Structures are given as C-alpha cells and as structure tokens.
Amino acid sequence: MSISCETPLGDVSHSSEILLVATGRTPTADELDLDSTDVITDCGYIVTDETMRTSVDDVFALGDVTNPHQLKHSANAEARVVSHNLINPDNLISVDLDPMPYAIFSNPQIASVGATEEDLLESQTEYVKGVAEFSEVAYGWAMENTDGFCKVLACPHTGRILGSHIMGPQASTLIHQLIQGMKFGQGVKELSRGMLYVHPALNEVVEVALLKAKDALH
C-alpha cells in the first residue's frame, strides 16, 4: 500500500506492507442481554439522561457504552456524576460535557475544541478567525518549528470563541486555555489583553491567534 500527498516542500510518498487502523471502539451493549431488561439502547449505546441514569431508575451507565465520544476525560466526568448519584439518590447532579475537547498524541500533536470552519460554513454561522504559526513566537522560533499553528474561531460581533484547533508541540496542553474561555464565556478580547502571557512561553502562540481574531471583530 502506498500513499502520496502534496506539501509545501513538494510531493511526498510513503509505502507500507501493513496498515494499522485504530479509529475508535464499537459499543457492545448487545452482549449484555439488555433485551431481557427495560434498559433502552440506541445504535448499540445505552441511553441515559443528564444524571447518567438509564431507562431503569436504579441503573446508571457511563463511558464508551453511553456516548460516541469514547474519550477518557468524558468517562471520568461521567464517573464522578454516577458516583455522587449512587450515594445521594435524593440529590442527583447532572453531567456537563460541553465543550468537548480532544487531542491526538501524534507527532505533531493535534488538539481541538468546538466548531471547525467547515461546521460554521455548513450552518451558515458568521465567524472571524485568527491563525498564528508557532514560528511567530520566540519559543516556536527557538524550536525551529515551521508547521505548527493555532487557530481561533470567534463570533464577529461578541468575540465569543466558537472553536479552536492547534497542531504542533504541546498542542494538548495549549488547548486548555481556549477550553476555559469557551466554558466560562471569556472572549478573544478578555483572553488576549485581559491577562499577561509569560515570555518566552509557547502559550504566546495562543495569545497571537487570539489577538488576530480580536482585530478581525466587526
């Protein structure tokens, strides 16, 4: 098997005798004999409400079997909710997985949260963007990184962050500031100029992307 792709440095080809596909897991609720119970499933996933309770009052479910995210951090959040609700049946709490971030620990790392440009175009949502390359900041320049970037997508009127996508070293760490901004309503203005960024930390690439998005606001 071979694959070819075009890059700024020219065409690149790779050949291999084996292709490893690791693209997620399939729920196996059908192996739990749930048909003999009142627990409802949908496309193999166990259906739960916001408290992680199934269609049977005293039965809770969490993790990969309940949602397609199949991410450890979402399962951790669900586990905290289920643990509380099992111990406190008269004081149930709800799980909140929004916004759902993810990271790919490849080389380079990739991290993402919220909408992509394709999502926003498809939904006809107005947006502005700020894109900063790692090479624009001191740490990235010192690393001689030429392909890493941080992209911030924001509402053109309010500056609310709609999504962010990072590729490069420490992307899985850098994305957290933008997750926090989305979660707590901190827009590009507040995050870019409402705090100081340590120099020459790699976080400056996030600052530059936020500044570019801020400057593009209407």
Question: Model-predicted segments: where are they?
Answer:
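Short, acidic, Ser/Thr-enriched surface-loop or helix-capping motifs
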Residues: 8, 49-50, 155-156
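FAD-site-proximal beta/loop scaffold in flavoenzymes
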Residues: 14-89, 192
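Flexible, glycine-rich terminal cap/loop adjacent to redox cofactors
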Residues: 106-116, 121-218
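Active-site-proximal substrate-binding core of FAD-dependent oxidoreductases
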Residues: 85-114
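A short, glycine/Asx- and small/polar-enriched loop/turn
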Residues: 1, 56-57, 143-148
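Conserved beta-strand-loop-beta-strand element in the redox core of flavoprotein oxidoreductases
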Residues: 1-13, 19
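Flavin (primarily FAD) cofactor-binding/catalytic cores of flavoenzymes
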Residues: 6-9, 54, 115-118
